[in-house]
UniProtKB/Swiss-Prot annotation:
Pathway: Cofactor biosynthesis; molybdopterin biosynthesis. One of its GO terms (biological process) is Mo-molybdopterin cofactor biosynthetic process. It comes from Synechococcus elongatus (strain ATCC 33912 / PCC 7942 / FACHB-805). Keywords: Molybdenum cofactor biosynthesis, Nucleotide-binding, Phosphoprotein. Belongs to the MoaD family. Heterotetramer of 2 MoaD subunits and 2 MoaE subunits. Forms a stable heterotetrameric complex of 2 MoaD and 2 MoeB during adenylation of MoaD by MoeB. During catalysis MoaD shuttles between the two heterotetrameric complexes. Involved in sulfur transfer in the conversion of molybdopterin precursor Z to molybdopterin. The modification 1-thioglycine is found at G90. The modification Glycyl adenylate is found at G90. This is Molybdopterin synthase sulfur carrier subunit.
Amino acid sequence: MTTTITLICFGGLAALSPEGQPMPLELDLPATAADLKVAIARACDLMPDSALAQLLQKSAIGSETRIYIDSDLIPASLSHLALLPPVSGG
């Protein structure tokens, strides 16, 4: 089964989506959060050793109600997800 998920990219990951707009992505289900990151990298033609690809791998994937770790399955019912890069504060 394939679903379309709209990705909202924050911080340095905003460079993945044209003009900072939400980015639609076709995803084959079942898929984990790690599978989603691979699909994003492919869709954006990221070289594995690029800074943006490395940032994507360190980033969290979130919905309105939770954060998904790499081993979590992405529910078929989700239509929007956020890409959240690591941040530091002080």
